[in-house]
Every structure is written in structure tokens, then in C-alpha cells.
């Protein structure tokens, strides 16, 4: 996978309401492990959609890894006004998504529901695969994008699972 779409749970989906949550250490350790694997297997681009939660944590780890690895970061927002109503702390996270190698907006603003499907299709057509933190047993609106990913047999999916995190937590004292 040369270009990898990053999508996953939002922080509130996981009950994480602050940057000091201890679970983030384990999540970020797992992200670091997975990104190194992807980088060592040819990844050149990480593509974000600008959502809070998993994408923020991947972006933070990726920016650290850019000191050691040569790869690019892109954010393709669905709307130009995405995040304009976020609080100050989240505005900083939005600014980080805009401080990448490539930024694009799919639409100026929301007009109709079909924009979401078209946007998801564009993301899948523009990337080779995805780095995904999602579990079908804990559904969110990500289920639609995940379903589209699975329908394309050529689309590669690298998943971070709750089992991965549990295993990482068991070994965390060694990290």
C-alpha cells in the first residue's frame, strides 16, 4: 500500500474525553507499531479526513515518525467549513490537520446526503488501502465506508482491533 487512508473511531465513541487519558498511551503504541509496519512495506502517503479521535492520534504519531521515515501526509476534508464550530482545543487539532503536505476540500459546504457517498468513493479510489480502527460489533457511521472497502477485493485493509489493544495493554509494562 503506497497511499493509506486513515479512518477510525472518534474519541467519544471510545469514551475518551481528554488528551491525558491513560488508554491513549496504549493506543499510540499500537499505532506506532502499525505505522512502522506500513512504512517498512512501502507506504508513502497517509491520507486523513480531519476527524477527531483515531485520526488525530495517528497524525500525532505520524509527525513523530517523519523524523525517521520519508513519507507524506494529506488531509482531504469533506467540507471547507469542517470543524468551524469546534472548541479551542479541537481547533488546535484541526490546525494540525491543515499543517500537512497536501490539503484538499471535497465540497464548499453541505448540500445533500449524496455528498457523503461520493466523498467516500473518492477516498477509496484515491488510496490503495486503509488503516482502520473499527469493530463491526461496535458500529458507528463508519460502517458504510467499511462496507465499501470490503466490497472492493483489491482494497487492502490494515485493522487495529480491540484485541490488538488488549494484547498491547498486557505487554505495556515492557514498552
From Swiss-Prot:
- UniProt-recorded name of the protein: UPF0398 protein SGO_0588
Species lineage = Bacteria, Bacillati, Bacillota, Bacilli, Lactobacillales
Write down the superkingdom of origin: Bacteria
Protein family (similarity comment) = Belongs to the UPF0398 family.
Annotated organism of origin: Streptococcus gordonii (strain Challis / ATCC 35105 / BCRC 15272 / CH1 / DL1 / V288)
Cross-referenced Pfam families: YpsA
